[in-house]
Amino acid sequence: GAAEYLSEDKDPERLMKICRASSSMPLAAPIANVDGIPYMDGGLADSIPIEYALEKGNDKIVVVLTRNPGYRKKRAVKATEQLYKRAYKKYPNLVRTIMTRNAVYNKQMKLIEKLEEEGKIFVIRPLIPTVSRMEKDYDKLQHFYMHGNRLMKKEYQGLLEYLNE
């Protein structure tokens, strides 16, 4: 139920397992094993690893968000909780982590907004409504992609200035 930060620079097979684990979304992908330990997407426990970046002593932090300013996650409904409990009955800590993810995310966003306001971090986020994870409409996807492209061109100079201060 806790986030771990794995790395690998020698064993390509282990690296692939880590990549598989990092993209193992609940109910959509199987639990992945790395070194005999079951893992799922670390974003469940640490959606935006801002505290980790600060603990590591990074003095320049760039946060790329996928949601609009002011977005907050809502708590999952009871039926969803029951579904997770059934699917992951062997992993009660995972279920607990999934069900409290919104509170952790919202706390992280509060910290990010504070640090951004203080000029301590650089944040890039969409300014238009996002597309859903399951979006298939090419025009909507293209529109959102182009927004990101234009936004980055607009923010690029500010990013360079932040990184070079």
Give the residues covered by each predicted segment.
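Patatin-like phospholipase
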Residues: G1-E165
